[in-house]
Every structure is written in C-alpha cells, then in structure tokens.
C-alpha cells in the first residue's frame, strides 16, 4: 500500500474515532508492526502533546495524520510496558495506554457457551471487572451489543466524553476494553452508537453496583472482598430437603418497614458518614435505613417473632420507588438505596448467623422502558421482542424478555446463579409467572400472537423457566424456588425431567382468595360458604403449595388484613387471630406480609412505614404474641410441616358442620405417628359440650387457643385439656366434649402419660364400682 493510501486510511480512521464510529480501534492503536520496526499509536482527544515513556527513555509523539492520533516508532515491540505523558488543557498526567492490552478477555469457550445460552457464570466475563493485565491494575469492561456501530466507555475518567475510550469489537457481538489505573467506585456508562447514527447512554446490564436514584450510572465494584462466616449454614442448607422443614416467611419491603430521621447520620461500616437517602418527597425529614441498620433492627425482630425466613421484595436496582422494585434496571446489583453490595452481603451473613434464611423476589417476566436500561439496547430489540403483541405489557408499561434468544436467556439464568453464589441467598420467589406462561395475559383479542402451534401458551417462557430451575437446583440443591402462579397451569412444582416447570413451591392463590372471601363475610352468612374453607384440601396435594397472605392483598383499596374483617373491633381481632391460626395449621408452608403480625390497620404505603405505635395497644400486641406462639408451636410440632405434601399429613374429622361454621381435622406426622387435633369455630357464638371424634382414647392437652387472654381473647377454653369419653362420633369410638370459644381455633395433642394416668384412674373407679355392686 502506497504512502498516500496509508495516509488516507489513517485520516479516515482518525475521523471515525473522533466521531465515535470506530469498532476496531486496536487495528490502528497500540503497538503496530511497521517497516521501520514498531509504531506505537495512542488516541488522545484534545491533547496538546503526548510523550512516550518506555524503558527509561522518552520520545515526543507526533500527530502526522490526525490531530488526536499520536505516534512514534520504536525498534522493538514494547508490549504493554510503557506509559504516556499527556498534556491537555494545561494539566499534565501520566497513564498506561488502554490500547496496549490486546489479549481477548472473553475466550472462545466463553463465547460458545454464551451463544448457546449455557454460560452459568457469564457475569465473571461480562460487566466491569477489577483485574490485572500484564501486572497492571485496572478495569476490564465487557459488553454484548451485537448490532452497535460503536461502543465507548463514559465516566468521570473522561469527563463523560465518549470520544476518549472506544471499545474493541470481538466475535459474537462482544465489546471489550481494559482501562488501566481505573479504581473501585468509579462511575461509568456505555455510549452506544447505533447503525442509523443514534447515540444512547446505557447503564451496564451486568453492573455490580449502581448510583442511588435518581442518578443511574453504574459503579465499578469488587466481587471478591467479603469474608463470609456462614459456612455451616450453607452446608446444612444444601444437604437438606427444604420441603421437609418448617418454613414460615416474613415478606417485607426494606424501604417501608421503618424509617430513620434524616437528622440521624448514615454511618458506613468504616465509621465515615455518608449522605442519607431520603425516604420520599412526601415524607420529608425521613431517610431510609441502611443494610447495616436493618441488620441490627430487623433481624432480631424477625428472630423474636419466630419466622424461619425473610422474603425481600425486589432489592435489585430499580429507578422508581413506586414500582416496589418490580421494574428492574440493575439485575446484577443490590439497590444502593440501602448501601453497598458488601453491606448487603453482611446483612445476609447476619441473617444466617441468627438462623434466618433469605428469599428475594426475582422478576424475569418483564423490564421497564427507562432510557438507561435494557430497552432497545443496541439500537435493536435486543433483550425484548420487537412485536408488541408478544414483547410488551401495555397495562404495566413494560417490555417482555425475548426468551427465544439464547444470550437473553443466559443473562437471566446466570443472574439466578449470581445471586445464590455471590450473596448466599436461600431462595427466590418468581413474580408474575402467569404473565410469562400465557401470551394472551391481560390482552384483548387481536392484541396477542399465538405460538407456533396456534395456542396461547408461551413455549419459550416455559423452556426458560425449566432451564432456570434445572440450573438452580443443579448448583444449589437445598434452595427454594417459589412460583407466584395464579392459574391452574399443571405441574408447576414437578421436576423438569417429567415435564414440570421445576419449582419446588407454588403460592396457593386459590386458598388465599377463598380465605379472604370467607373471612370478609358476616359470620352469620359463613354457614352458606363452608366450601370456601374446605375446598383447598381437595387440591392441596396436586402441587407443593405455600400459603401466602402477601403485599398484593393490602394495597389499592383492598384494606389491610385486620380491616377486611367484619364486626366490631373485638370481632376483627378475633377473626384475624382465627385466620392466622388456620393458616398455620393448614397444610403448606407459610408467608405473611409485614404488618399482619401485629394487626396493621392502614393499607401498606411504599413511601411510609408500618404503624408501630399500634403495639402500644393490647389487642395489637396480642396478635403479635399470637404469631410468636404460632411460629413456636409450628416449629416444635413436626405434624404441622413434615408431611405437608403427603396426603397422610392431613385428615378431616368433620368438615360438614356448616350450620355452626365449625371444622375439625388432624395433622399427622408419618415417621413418629404423632398427630394433632385442630378444631375451629368461625362464628362469634361459643359452644359448650361440642363433640369431636378422635382416633385414640386418653387425655388431649389443649396446646393452643386463639381465644386466650394473652392474645386479647375472652379466655374461654378447656382448662388445659380434656379426657375422652366413650361416645362414638365422626367415625371414632371416642370423642372429646369441648368448649369452643367464639371466633377461635384450638389445637390439642394426645398426651400418652396423662392418658395412662387417666386410664389407670378409670380402671380403679371401675373396680370400686364392681366391688360396691357385690356388696
């Protein structure tokens, strides 16, 4: 190639760099072989002079072809072992040359697995990584944007000018650039120029930390600095079957549990202050608690209540508080509202130290249209479908992932592995599964597209969920994967190997709606709706169900749980206690939303906090004590949880006394053969001498009574227990003559020791009677 041609080529490359239109800067920058040896070219926009520093020598670089492309010739290849001294705007500094580092970061196998959708640790390649190259510290940036014309790094390091740090395009639509000297905490974004010339500034899809809203830049964060202390917890978790354990979950939203005063400083773990994060404009003077403050206050509270797990509404980064976290933009980062990723790790570590598992809400069903997020990422519908009939939730104003694209599926599946591996979470609850499974979800006729078979099922979403759950349990066998699925889609909790979706628990939405419909009725009318409280048993063994009274039931005009109840205040409290006790004794794992544990009155408000002052009133304190005791009873009695998903674990005694709105049943445990008798009266009318058949004669201790004075009840009961009579009822030869308090639930346990004493006393009495007869 002639000199004029080379000159013309260099001028064109310089202009492409200056206009952010170059996709292969390594083709001309860095050390390049030349006729005279090696030509080193550096790209320094708006620099006045550049000097090469190498091997103790200095060489002033010239710009013969473009004013910002500086070069000099050496007799040898300097590799990456050189620096440049740059004078720009009267300021001089020295730096390593980003384009001296030519080796690819993403290897062939990485690209292959990613293109297949099977790279379970793709986050170890994608994103911004603090690393060393050739012994030099810096940050390696890696991005997937296959349709972009060019991609640049923006940040404080270049005054947010995309001309300074163009990235190199590799195979498979991958873009890379190593920036030496860049440190942890640096802000950055990607500037993506599309094929039609538009320019977008995007946060890193794989960013490990982001700014506090309303700012939305990504933050360079370290992944490997935290020292965990939960090894024994993790070992126990992964070697046990969670379905055979008691699971009682406290669902909560970190930002509205309780607030601190904005006057109270936010102290970081190193003791330095940090600017507080305001709770909301509508609550001036309040700030959000930090992860550290939540660990100090929330964890002891949850432990005292006796819950086994905390479920966090989405803590992935999101721009809008009002979305409750369900419109995610930062999939690989805990929200910075409450602190740093390591501070969230410390929160989880503390939970495990106190015996509490951590479940997070995971939202793979949709994402928002925010300009800095995934939408139209590289100038094409990269993460979403282009056709709005399958790519948009119009009612929610969000976009739907394109599950048929391998790299998109990989982004989500690896994200699941990331949260379990990096943050030691114990489970996920997958939000809005029904919206993923059906193409016509919330869509009128004509606004949805049938699948390849002409049906409404989203086969790509089904395959994605199966893959996600398969990979999850492959890596973390003791994990929880909970589906919020509101339809009758079959085999949600069956293994993927036999065609199931692969979850191990499913929220029982039918139970929830039936219970709330029933308890909202005036008690007199409940006799006509007995089916509401008994129907769930007919299908409870078709899936592994979790009973949930969730956040969705205490917003948007639905009232909080206490205020759903009919009657005067006394009846509202009693109904609430009875419902919670029925939930804890019914087959299935348990979840309640924050505030229900003490009878919150007001609807949940994401910008407020809970009505903690209500605990100054005895009835509310009574509900809290009831929940404490329910959790204690639940964990102490394997009959209430061991056989949740085996029909042996439940047996009706009587479900047909609709006239009195009374039900009775047994919870049984197969390995020990123990059982509990549960009797519930769902009217304000108490009953004396109410007969309940039992399978074995003897003494039955009353171990729980929702009407106890301790809980704010009328303190009716059975004096601690009752012996059986030889009175046949409900198919049993023996029965209990019980007092049923109003709006109550009672639990009885057969006491072998006292039964033996009672039997002995009965035998003596019988012998005395026979002696008296002979006289």
Swiss-Prot record:
GO terms for molecular function: 1,4-alpha-glucan branching enzyme activity; cation binding; hydrolase activity, hydrolyzing O-glycosyl compounds. Pathway: Glycan biosynthesis; glycogen biosynthesis. It catalyses: Transfers a segment of a (1->4)-alpha-D-glucan chain to a primary hydroxy group in a similar glucan chain. The active site is at 431 (nucleophile), 484 (proton donor). SUPFAM superfamilies: (Trans)glycosidases, E set domains, Glycosyl hydrolase domain. GO terms for biological process: glycogen biosynthetic process. Belongs to the glycosyl hydrolase 13 family. GlgB subfamily. Monomer. Catalyzes the formation of the alpha-1,6-glucosidic linkages in glycogen by scission of a 1,4-alpha-linked oligosaccharide from growing alpha-1,4-glucan chains and the subsequent attachment of the oligosaccharide to the alpha-1,6 position. NCBIfam families: branching_enzym, PRK05402.1, PRK12313.1. This is 1,4-alpha-glucan branching enzyme GlgB. It comes from Parasynechococcus marenigrum (strain WH8102).
